[in-house]
Curated annotation (Swiss-Prot):
It comes from Staphylococcus epidermidis (strain ATCC 35984 / DSM 28319 / BCRC 17069 / CCUG 31568 / BM 3577 / RP62A). GO terms for biological process: 6-sulfoquinovose(1-) catabolic process; D-tagatose 6-phosphate catabolic process; lactose catabolic process via tagatose-6-phosphate. Belongs to the aldolase LacD family. Gene3D superfamilies: Aldolase class I. It comes from the Bacteria. It is an enzyme of class 4 (lyase). Keywords: Lactose metabolism, Lyase. This is Tagatose 1,6-diphosphate aldolase. Pathway: Carbohydrate metabolism; D-tagatose 6-phosphate degradation; D-glyceraldehyde 3-phosphate and glycerone phosphate from D-tagatose 6-phosphate: step 2/2. GO terms for molecular function: 6-deoxy-6-sulfofructose-1-phosphate aldolase activity; tagatose-6-phosphate kinase activity; tagatose-bisphosphate aldolase activity. InterPro entries: Aldolase_TIM, DeoC/FbaB/LacD_aldolase, LacD_aldolase, Tag_1.6-dipho_adolase. Its EC number is 4.1.2.40. HAMAP family: LacD.
């Protein structure tokens, strides 16, 4: 599927000069509220959430090719970003209904691809929970939903970034060794599926295909994959799509995420960048709540800067240009 000139131009705004997407993710809503609630007894306010996003945007977007924000709390942060930093806006509601089976997708009801574009977005991002082993009844609804969003983005001539998070309802802990064993197939098969032209996806935002905490040499305890098995899963992932794809940081530490990117590259994965969130900014949450705005800025200018600068250094030697796809 060839991209329109408008879509190509928009993705260029989200990338650096080398064609690498070095994007900062701060579209967290539910997860951010939970992180903030760990450090204060009262419920986080809208003002607190918006201000923290603004701080991160003001301090770190000069080092990122683009930033992913949500239109619920992130619009002030989008205005505060560096002039050279592109903008992705999230289209999904945060989280999913834990009382209903299937983790069905849901758009923010007051937004559309048209409205996100009018808000200044260079791309629309949508998060989908997907299990290739779920029932056809569940998965056909998800496929149809993604087809709708893809068609919307084609109509508006705006790039569609699809984020896929895998799960298994029979394995409640997705950080367990049990899930680590099934993760490679679930991640790679979902990528293969949503690379089909009918979905009109332009860039995939994906998990790495293994849990690095269970890889030989990375693991402190149980080993699920040898280094060679893990490397093969990365190669299989690369072969699963013809689309540009970028990795999400999944809340791991900055150091582990950087080591993961090196491992992916050494395995032969031709990934095209990252959308890195908590691995870059999570430490600022506690500082912001306990010590205030100025202390949070100082954290972002030192530790936050080091996290993103180290990541950019790693990307220079590991990621490849999406224009090669």
């Amino acid at each position: 599927m060839t991209k329109s000139q408008q879509k190509v131009s928009s993705i260029e705004k989200l990338s650096n000069q080398e064609g690498i997407i070095s994007a900062l993710a701060f579209d967290q809503r539910g997860a951010l509220k939970r992180m903030m609630a760990e450090h204060q007894s009262e419920t986080p306010t809208v003002e607190q959430i918006e201000q923290l996003k603004v701080l991160v945007s003001e301090e770190l977007t000069q080092y990122a090719s683009s930033i992913l924000l949500d239109p619920e709390y992130g619009l002030p942060a989008s205005d505060a970003r560096n002039n050279d930093c592109g903008l992705l806006l999230a289209y999904e509601k945060t989280g999913y209904d834990v009382n209903a089976k299937g983790r069905l997708p849901d758009c923010l009801v007051e937004w559309s691809a048209k409205r996100l574009k009018e808000q200044g977005a260079n791309a629309v991002k949508f998060l989908l929970y997907y299990d290739v082993d779920d029932t056809e009844e569940i998965n056909i609804q998800k496929k149809a939903y993604i087809e709708r969003i893809g068609s919307e983005c084609v109509a508006e001539d705006i790039p569609f970034f699809l984020e896929v998070l895998t799960y298994d309802d029979n394995i409640p802990d997705n950080k367990s060794a049990e899930f680590a064993k099934v993760k490679p197939r679930k991640v790679n098969e979902a990528m293969k599926l949503f690379s089909e032209d009918r979905f009109n996806v332009d860039v995939l935002k994906v998990e790495v295909p293994v849990n690095m905490n269970f890889v030989e040499g990375f693991s402190e305890g149980e080993v699920v994959y040898t280094k060679e098995e893990a490397a093969q899963h990365f190669r299989d992932q690369d072969a699963a799509t013809h689309l540009p794809y970028i990795y999400l940081s999944a809340g791991v530490s900055a150091e582990l995420f950087q080591d993961t990117l090196k491992f992916a590259h050494d395995s032969g994965a031709q990934f095209n960048g990252v959308l890195c969130g908590r691995a870059t900014w999570s430490g600022a949450v506690k500082v912001y709540i306990e010590e205030g705005e100025q202390a949070a800025r100082e954290w972002l200018r030192t530790v936050g800067f080091k996290n993103i600068d180290d990541l950019n250094t790693v990307l220079k030697t590991t990621a490849t240009s999406w224009k090669n796809k």
